[in-house]
Amino acid sequence: MMNISDNPLRPGDTAPRFQLPAVNREGTVSLEDYRDKRAVMVCLYRGLHCPFCRRHIARLATVRDKLGEQGVATVAIVNTELERARQYFQYRPVRVELGTDPEALTHRAFGVTKFVLMPDTTDPRELQWPRTSTMAQLMNNPVNPHGDLPEKMNLMAATQYLNQKDGFEMTDVDARISQANGTQFTSQFLVDAGGVVRWSFVEARDGPEGMGGSAGEEEMVAAAKAIGR
């Protein structure tokens, strides 16, 4: 059983061991597979209901190749059920090692939690981002991560726009995962061959305007190069 951390792991912390069902092959995805062999970029995402996450995963194929040139493997973990992931990625294959974690326990073992939505009547002085927020606060902080939108939009409008653009149809599994973990943060952790975190990025640390964001390709490759020196 993985231990749950209240705060995101930092460089120097030991990464949690995980073993999860693999999406694009039989077997499992495990951090131990890389122990004493090579570093790993572990990317933790929300479920397929999240259009930003779907796009980040699609872009990982390019990043994966560049990280591979630095001797770093790439593993993405999606907060959904195995059969749903296999159904989706069968028609949208990606050249990235994928695992599923429907309870998001791996995310929380890395200290990446979800925020609690409070009533809109909550005194703003009582809100403590990234632990708590209100729907009003989220709607008042428009986003456009990585320029995927024609202009900045609130999260609900952005999600609807991208889902429609992608032709994405929500399933019962997607709806259930969204209900349970819709406010889960995403993250990327570079773990060296010894199992130690060397670099990390966690979504929206500075405020809700960062929702939907992810570490950029250049940032991840630079981190990989840094541990190779």
What is the meaning of each model-derived region?
Residues 56-109:
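Structural microenvironment flanking redox-active thiols in thiol-disulfide oxidoreductases
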Residues 101-209:
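Thiol/selenol-based redox catalytic cores and closely related redox-interacting motifs
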